[in-house]
């Protein structure tokens, strides 16, 4: 490994120690490399504004940074173990091509605020993707709730048959959940949309850095003012972003659980498209719902990433090398979470209900609540009506139909009044 920015003359670096220090940092930095380049361009512009760089030097740096970005995208430049991290790779390339101008690029900044700003830009993009996918899932669910509002579905509590419900209610529940997930991702975006570049190692520098320019140039909503807080926010903002992602993957896990049950032979309420299933290596008869099972497992990866960062943050103020480990947590957590969420809209759009199976699972006892409420409306104290309905639950369905039960469920949000217009207005507000 070459290009150690911190190496002192005459001090040897033990290879094993350096390998331990670097870990898989340079591989993870491939996620942040283009963001680091963008921030380096903005930083160079700020240095020119205060006279550290000439216009000619700025032009050369900007050109080389653009070329490096192009080479990285095309594969002509590979960020690998020749470098300690993405920061040293950028400085090495600029120094090789431009000499002194490349050696000036790090004036007024530290790798601490360098990775902070690159990570912050990366998190903003990831949160926008969480919001977009949550919005897309909500749209599918709203459309299907409208189309299948009157399709009877058995409602369960404790995984036991409970009351008559509808596909519309099932879909409306997920629509509202993912609208909230999009709102949460957008709110978290606003939290992290603050520029730490120019805070250096956490104590500022003796230069009048043009932080207002880098804030505007990089598209941040505001300046992160305190250098101390800039360091305190590392890990805190990553944790908030993972919590926003986790809200979506938690709901994904519960959808996947429903579908795991509903596609089983014991329920057989739902048929999945063939591309969402696999087979067995030994049992020719099997058609396994592996996609939804791995979707269900995804939240564990996101929760593990969140837990790792929570444990890392048992630190005093200031920068500590422990925080390097937060990179792997967010990269792996978001990779798993977004990969699963990407598949969800199409899966939901293409699953098929089996109306005959749904209807056959609605038994007489599932009308008992209707009987009790109707008696209460007629003047019988509800607790007495409840006891009478419980005693006669086996015959509660006589003369009743699932459609009749759904039509009577008029409380706001229930089957006869899904209030999809309210949910659609909330969805439209996300656009």
From Swiss-Prot:
GO biological process, one term: L-arginine biosynthetic process
Name of one Pfam family that matches: Lyase_1
GO MF annotation list: argininosuccinate lyase activity
Alphabetized PROSITE patterns for the sequence: FUMARATE_LYASES (PS00163)
UniProt-annotated location(s): Cytoplasm
Gene3D superfamilies: Fumarase/aspartase (C-terminal domain) (1.10.40.30), Fumarase/aspartase (Central domain) (1.20.200.10), Fumarase/aspartase (N-terminal domain) (1.10.275.10)
Pathway: Amino-acid biosynthesis; L-arginine biosynthesis; L-arginine from L-ornithine and carbamoyl phosphate: step 3/3
GO cellular component: cytosol
Reaction it catalyzes: 2-(N(omega)-L-arginino)succinate = fumarate + L-arginine
Entry EC number(s): 4.3.2.1
Keyword annotations: Amino-acid biosynthesis, Arginine biosynthesis, Cytoplasm, Lyase
Domain of life: Bacteria
Keyword check for Transmembrane: no
Recorded family membership: Belongs to the lyase 1 family. Argininosuccinate lyase subfamily.
Protein name: Argininosuccinate lyase
Organism field: Xanthomonas campestris pv. campestris (strain ATCC 33913 / DSM 3586 / NCPPB 528 / LMG 568 / P 25)
């Amino acid at each position: 490994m070459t290009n150690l920015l911190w190496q002192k003359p005459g001090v040897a670096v033990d290879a094993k120690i350096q390998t331990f220090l670097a870990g898989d940092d340079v591989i993870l930095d491939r996620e942040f490399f283009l963001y680091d380049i963008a921030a380096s361009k903005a930083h160079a512009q700020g240095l020119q504004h205060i006279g550290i760089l000439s216009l000619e030097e700025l032009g050369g740096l900007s050109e080389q940074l653009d070329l490096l970005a192009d080479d990285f995208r095309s594969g002509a430049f590979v960020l690998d173990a020749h470098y300690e991290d993405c920061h040293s790779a950028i400085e090495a390339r600029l120094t090789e091509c431009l000499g002194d101008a490349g050696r000036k690029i790090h004036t007024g900044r530290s790798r601490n605020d360098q990775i902070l700003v690159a990570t912050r830009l990366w998190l903003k993009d990831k949160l926008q993707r969480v919001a977009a996918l949550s919005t897309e899932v909500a749209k599918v669910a709203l459309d299907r709730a409208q189309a299948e509002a009157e399709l009877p579905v058995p409602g369960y509590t404790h995984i036991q048959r409970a009351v008559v419900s509808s596909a519309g209610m099932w879909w409306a529940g997920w629509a509202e959940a993912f609208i909230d997930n999009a709102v949460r991702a957008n709110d978290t975006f606003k939290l992290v949309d603050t520029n730490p570049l120019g805070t250096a190692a956490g104590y500022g520098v003796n230069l009048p850095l043009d932080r207002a320019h880098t804030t505007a140039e990089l598209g941040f909503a505001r300046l992160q003012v305190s250098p101390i807080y800039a360091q305190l926010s590392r890990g805190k903002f990553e944790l908030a972003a993972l919590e926003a992602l986790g809200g979506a993957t938690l709901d994904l896990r519960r959808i996947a659980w429903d579908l795991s049950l509903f596609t089983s032979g014991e329920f057989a309420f739902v048929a999945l498209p063939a591309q969402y299933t696999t087979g067995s290596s030994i049992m020719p008869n099997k058609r396994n719902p592996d996609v939804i099972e791995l979707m269900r497992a995804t939240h564990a990866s996101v929760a593990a990433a969140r837990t790792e960062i929570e444990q890392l943050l048992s630190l005093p103020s200031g920068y500590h090398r422990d925080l390097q480990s937060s990179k792997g947590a967010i990269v792996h957590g978001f990779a798993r979470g977004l990969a699963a969420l990407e598949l969800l809209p199409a899966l939901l759009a293409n699953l098929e209900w089996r109306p005959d199976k749904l209807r056959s699972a609605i038994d007489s006892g599932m009308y008992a609540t209707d009987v009790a409420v109707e008696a209460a409306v007629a003047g019988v104290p509800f607790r007495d009506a409840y006891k009478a309905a419980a005693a006669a639950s086996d015959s509660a369905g006589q003369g009743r139909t699932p459609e009749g039960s759904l039509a009577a469920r008029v409380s706001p949000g229930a089957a006869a009044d899904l209030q999809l217009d309210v949910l659609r207005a909330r969805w439209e507000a996300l656009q």
